[in-house]
Amino acid sequence: MAVMCDVDSTEKCEFPALYNFGDSNSDTGGRHAAMTEFPPQNGETFFGHPSGRFSDGRVIIDFIAEDLKLRYLSAYLDSIGTSFRQGANFAFGGSTIRPPGYSPFHIAIQISQFVQFKLLV
């Protein structure tokens, strides 16, 4: 889920924070933090070190954050030493919209994590 500004709009678009839910298309390290390390190149080419992403560079939410002039989102599950001032990423590679099955972090779990997150910040 993402809200974007109309590129033809004359209104200024400002977001103090960005929150993302999804799967591998926008996972910035959630699955990596919860499960196991990925073999290289998980983001090394763009970031210069392994980043836990499902690509060798940025994922779609990184481009959205750049466009909104926000920092790249940290994975909610990779929270040690992380600042969530400009948002958090609840996406998890392999997630589904259906209840338990292939992924333990289906969309209902991501929403539950967001509710917990709101109570803490």
Predicted regions and their residues:
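Conserved active-site regions of diverse hydrolases
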Residues: 1-121
